[in-house]
């Protein structure tokens, strides 16, 4: 089964066996972490900054390929989060996928087109990336709740509320199949 590093990669599934293989892969490789919202921070990488310098500055824990893809083809936004593993506080800085931006804004209790817009359109300018990061960081710092963070294929795919129930995909697929057969 393949790792999907790029935000716009699509995996086509043509059979029930391929679906099962994909679900097993997701179950084995997806990681959910719990992180305090007020300890989350958004970083950007400046265009002239070398990847190694960025990794040192931000404390990034992921591959150069994932960083480069996030900068060149993705959001160019990285999330620093804290989690507890075996009683120890661990930190990570990883790329944010497009799919994670809205859920990040939900955790910061902010929203609106100006914050997630990436393309200049007629009559609409794009807010500079660092300004977006500053706004999001100020708002994240206000909330002491915890969030569930989905780490998938070296990127953050979602940041859900602490009450979000993580369900097994296999069980959901089987339930849907059962309903469709009836």
State each model region's role:
Residues 2-175:
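Feature for intrinsically disordered/low-complexity regulatory segments and propeptides
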Residues 178-182:
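Charged low-complexity "KEKE/polyampholyte" interaction tracts
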């Amino acid at each position: 089964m393949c790792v999907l590093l790029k935000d716009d990669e699509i995996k086509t599934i043509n059979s029930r066996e391929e679906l099962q293989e994909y679900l097993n892969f997701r179950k084995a490789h997806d990681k959910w972490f719990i992180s305090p919202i007020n300890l989350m921070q958004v970083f950007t990488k400046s265009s002239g900054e070398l990847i190694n310098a960025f990794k040192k500055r931000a404390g990034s824990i992921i591959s150069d390929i994932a960083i480069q893809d996030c900068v060149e083809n993705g959001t160019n936004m990285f999330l620093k989060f804290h989690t507890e593993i075996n009683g120890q506080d661990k930190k990570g800085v990883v790329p944010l996928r497009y799919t994670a931006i809205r859920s990040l804004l939900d955790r910061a209790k902010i929203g609106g087109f100006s914050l997630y817009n990436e393309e200049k359109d007629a009559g609409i300018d794009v807010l500079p990336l660092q300004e977006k990061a500053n706004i999001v960081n100020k708002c994240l710092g206000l909330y002491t709740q915890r969030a569930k963070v989905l780490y998938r294929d070296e990127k953050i795919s979602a940041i859900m509320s602490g009450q979000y129930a993580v369900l097994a995909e296999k069980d959901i697929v089987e339930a849907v199949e059962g309903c469709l057969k009836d």
